[in-house]
Amino acid sequence: MAYPNDVRNVWDVYNVFRDVPNREHLIRDIRNGLVTVRNLTNMLTNMERDDQLIIAQLSNMMKSLSIGVEKAQNELSKLKTTDADRAAVLAAYQTSVLNIERNTMLLTGYFKQLVLDLTGYVGASVYPILPFMITGDQSMMVDSVKVNMKNVFDDKHEQEIVLPIHPACFVSTITEDTSSVVYADGDELYSVHVRHATMTMYVNVLGETVETRQLSMIGESIVPDDFAPSLLILRFSQDSVGEVFYLSHGNMKKFLGYSLEYTDKCSIFDVARRVSTTRNTIPNGFCSVDGVPYLDGRFIYQPSGVSADSNICAIYNSYVLDTLRYITECEVDTLRSVYDQTSSTSFSKTDVLTSSLLTMQSNISALSAATPQLANDVITFDSTDLLSLGTVLTVSNEFTADDTILSTSLAGHCQVDYSEGSPQDKSMSISVSCDSSQLVSSTVHSYSADILGHGLKGDRTMNLMINVPGLMNPQKVTVDYVYSDGYKLNFASVVAPGAPFWINATLQLSVSPSAHNMLSKLTPLDNDACPGLKAQANTPILVSMTINLDDATPALGGEVIQNCVFKIHHGDDVYSFVTDFDVVSYTSTSGTNCLKLISSVDITSQLPSDMVIYVMNGSPDAAFTSGDSVNMSSVDWHQSTSQTVGNYVYTTMKAYWNVTSYDVEARPYTTYVPGKVNFTAVEHADVFVDDYNTGVNSYVIVNSRIYYKGTPLYIEVPSGSFIKVSYFTSPLKNPTVDTYNAEISRNSAYLIKANASLDSVATMLNNISNRIDAMERLMEPTRAQQIAGVVSSIGGVISLGMPLLGAIVVTIGTIISIADPDKQGIDYHSVANAFMSWCQYAAVCRYEYGLLKRGDEKLDVLSFMPKRVVSDFKNKPDVISLPELGESVLRGSSTDYLDTGINIIYNDMQLLGQGKLSGWLNKTVSKVENNAANFFERNLVKSLANKEVLPMHARVEITQTEKIGDVYRTTILYTGINEGSYLGGDVFASRLGDKNILRMNGFESGPGRFKAIVESTTEVGNFRVVDWTVSGMSRYEIYAAAGEIYPSKDPSHADVQLLYESIVRDLTTRDGSFVLKHHDVLLLPGQLDAFEELIIRNASNYQYAFIGSNCQNYAHDVVDILTKFKRPQRWIKDDDFKLYIQSIYDAL
C-alpha cells in the first residue's frame, strides 16, 4: 500500500497509522523519538515487506508440516495488512511465533547445558545472572564483594565460576550500539559488542575475537545456534591458579598462559556496561555492578558407589523433563489465550490452531536438533598402495637423563699363540656397557599414514600407525650389535710377565648367539660393529587404526557392527588380519570431548618374534673405550723336573711350549659411547635389503624398513574394505572438558537396540490431522478450562498440542532406563508396556486421572488417586495430643500439605555454612514449596532435587489412614538414612525432625525408620498419640531414635512413652522442613507393614555414598518400591521383594 507524504508531523502519522500492523512497535518508536517524518515512508514500506515475508514464511511452514488444513492455508494467503482485523490476528500469531522461537532457543540452550551435565558437571540452569541491559535486574547479585565461595559439597574439588552470555538479551530491547565489558583484577576479561544496524554481536575474550553472531529475527531462516547461550568459565584449582575457558555452540577455547589469583576466595569481578548512541535522543549511560554471581549449582564431582553412566542417565532424563515442563506450561497458556481472543469472531478453529501447530513444529525441530539420533554408518576405504611398515612406524622415546647405562654381555675367547707347539684357547664373556645419555635427544621414527574412506555421513579418514611398545624403554631393552660375516674384533693383546716376546695372548670377540650374520661388510664404526637396541622376546608389533567420529555424542557412545580385513606382505607370503575396532570416548589436547574408533592388532600372532632390533646409526664420535682389558697371570718359566738316581738328583728345565695352563681374565669396564643417534637415517642400510639373512624369528628396524627374518614387511588395506558402526549423532556438537569416561560400550548396545521403538512412535503419531481433531475437541468452551488440569495431571511432560514431542521425550526416558537396568530396577517387559501406555496417552487423553495401566487389577489402584478423594478426606491429624508430655502440637504450616500418600521432606543440614548462600537456599526452597518461586528458582531447586544432589538432608514420610470401627488411625512411617533406628547391626543415635543428626558409632551410614501412630474418634482433626507398644518398635529402637544411650537397666514403660511422644513432637513440627515432592497414593491393605519388613531385611545391604547412593537416592528408591513396585537391585534382594509382593496379594 502507499503511504502519504504530506503529513505535518509525526503525531499525524500516529493518528493515521494507529491501526496498522505492528502499531505498538511503531508507537513506541514514535514516543522514543526514533521516527521522523523524513524516514517514515521508508520505515513503513520496510515494515510491510517484513509482514509479507512473515506471511510467506507461515504459509511455507504449514506446507512443510504436510497437514491437511487447506482452509487455513487459503485463509492465510488472503491476509493483507490493510485488513485491520485480520492484521490483528496475524500480529498475535506473529508474536506467538516469536515467543515460541525464543522458547525453542531456550530449550536448545538447555540441551547444550545438558551436554555439560553429561560429562561431570552437576548442573542447574544457566541463566543471565549478570544482566547485559542497562535497566537489567540486579537482584541476583551478591551484595558484598567479600563472599565465601566455598564449594557446596566439600573443599576437595575445583572451583567453578560460570558467566553466561545470552544473545537473546539483545534481540528485542537494544535499539542502539551496545557494549558490555567484564573485568577481572582490573583487566578486561571479555566484552560483548552489538551493532544495531546489522544486529551483529561480537564477543572478545582476553583481547581475542572468539565469535561473531547474527541476531536478526527476520529472514528466511533462524539459526538456533545464534541464540544459544555461551559460557565463560573460570576454573580455580587448589593452588589458586585460574584457567579461562570459552564455550560456544560450535567450539571451546582454552586460553593458555593466563592465570588469576584467587587466594582469598572473594570477588574478582567488576562489571561495567556502556551504552553509546547513534542519535542524541538517548543520553549516554553508564552502569557499574560490583559483586559475584551465585555459584549456580555447578560443581565437578566424581561419582562413587554406583557406575558413572547411572548418573549420566539420571541427569539427562530429569533435566529433559524439567525443561519441557516449562515449555509445555507456556504453550498451554498461549493456546488458551489465542482461543479466548478469537472465540467470538468468524475465524474457524483451524485458524485458532495455527499458532499451536507452529509451536509444535518449532519444538519438534528444536528437539530434533538437540536430541542425539541413531546413525548407522558404513565406512568404505579407497584403494591403497603397499606401505612399508617403517614408513608408518611411531616410536615413543622413554629415555631420560637418568637412564645412562645399558649393559650387555658379548661372547669371546682368548687364544694364546706360540712359536712352537699348538695354540691354546680359553672361552669367556665380556661385559660391555652403553652410555645412553645421548639417546634422550636422539631422532626416532614418528610416522603414520591417512587412508581416505567414505561413509554415509561424509568422508572419513583412518589414521594407520605401527607401534612397538617399550622399544625405547630403558627398563625393557638392552644394547646388542650387528656383525659382518666372519668378523673378529681384536679387543686386546697381552704378554705374560717374564715370558719371551714370542709368547702372547690375543683376546677376540666372536659372533654372539643373538647377533645377526651379515653377508656383506657393514662398517658404520671403525671396529666393524653396528649397535642396536634389542627388545625383549615376545614384544608385540601393533597395527593401530583410528577413525574420528566428530558428529557423535561422546557420552552415549556407539557400537561396531562389522570389522574389516588388512594384509601383511612378507615376500611372496600374504597374511590376513581382522581389525578389532572399539568405541572410545576421549578428551583431545584442545579440551574437546570426542568419540573415535580404535583398533589395535598384534601381527606377531602370525609372525612370531624372538627379538626386535632397532638399529642405530654410528656417529663420528662413537667408540669403544676400555682400560687394561685383558690380563695374563705370571708363570714360573724356570720350572724344572727332577729325577733321583742313586745318590744323584738329575734336574731338567721345562720347555716354554710345554706350559699347558694360563690364567687369562677380561676386565668388566668396557664402555660403548654411541653419541647422538638418528634412528631414521642409518648408513649402509642397503646391505639389509639384499644380503641380510638370519635363522631366527627376528625383526630388524632400519630406516623405512622393518625386516622379518631378512625380508621387508608391507601393509595393505584392500580396496573396498569397509566397517559398519552405529552411534548417536550430536547435532549441536557441544564440546566439553574434564569428562569422566562412562562405561559407554554397555550403554550403547541397549540404546541401539531401543532405536526401533523411537521410529515406531514417530510413525504412529505422524498423522497431524488426527492430532488437530483431538485438539479441536479439547478447545470446545465446555472443556477448554480442563487443559491446564490435564497437563498438570500428566506432570507437565506431554502437551496435547505436541504429542510427537511428548512421545519422543518418553522414549528418551525409556531408552535411558533400559540403558541402566541395574540402577532403575526394572525388567524390559514392564518397560515396553509402560512405554506403549505413555505413547497411547500422548495421542489421545483417555483417562481423567492417572497415567499407566499395568494390566493388574489388584495393583491398578496405585496408578492413580482421584483428587476429589483427597479433598473429601476431612479427618486429618491437624492437632496431636501428647498426654505423657502434657502438650499438644499443631501440624506444619504448609497450606498444601496432605496427610495421605508419600512426602519427601528436606532439611537444611548447614552444608553451605551459615552465610548468605545458605540463607538464600532455604528461602528459595521455601518459595518453591509454596509455589511462589520464579522459573529460574524453581528450575534450580527441582533440577538439583531430581538429580538427588540438593545440598539438604532428605527423608520419606509415609502416611496411611484407616477407619477401624469408630476410630480413625493414622500411621506415619518415617524412613531415611540415619533416621530413627538403624536397621542393621549397630544402632544409630540420631535426632529426628529439624535437629542435627548425632552419630555414635563412627561415620558409617545406613537406613533407619520410626513409626508414629495417632488415633481419633472425631472428624475435627484432633488426634492422640497411642501407646508406644502399638507401633511394634522395641525400647531399644525408640531410645536410639531419640538420640539417647540405652540405660543398663531396662527403662520403665512410662519413660519409653515419654521418649516416644517427644520424637512424634519433633517429627510433626515441620518448621525448618520443606515438602518438595508429594505423591498421592492410597496404600493397599498390608502394604505398609510389608514395606517395613522389606527394609528391615535389606537395610544392611545399602552401601552409602555421598554421590549416587545418598539420602536422596534412598528416598527415591522408597517411593519407587511403594508406588511402582520397582525393586532397587543394588540393595533389595529378589527373594525379599517377591515376599513383599506376595504379602500384599495375600492381604488383598
Swiss-Prot record:
PROSITE patterns: PPPDE (PS51858)
Keyword Hydrolase: no
Gene Ontology MF terms: peptidase activity
Predominant subcellular localization, coarse grouping: virion
Active site, per annotation: 953, 1111
All copies of domain PPPDE, residue ranges: 929-1148
TM annotation in the entry: none
Annotated keywords: Capsid protein, Host cytoplasm, Host-virus interaction, Outer capsid protein, Virion
Compartments it resides in: Virion; Host cytoplasm
Cellular-component GO terms for this entry: host cell cytoplasm; viral outer capsid
Record's function text: Minor capsid protein present in the outer capsid, which is required for adsorption of the virus onto host insect cells (Potential). Could play a role in the host plant virus induced dwarfism.
Assigned protein family: Belongs to the phytoreovirus minor outer capsid protein P2 family.
Subunit structure: Interacts with host ent-kaurene oxidases OSKO1, OSKO2, OSKOL4 and OSKOL5; this interaction.
Protein name: Minor outer capsid protein P2
Origin organism lineage: Viruses, Riboviria, Orthornavirae, Duplornaviricota, Resentoviricetes
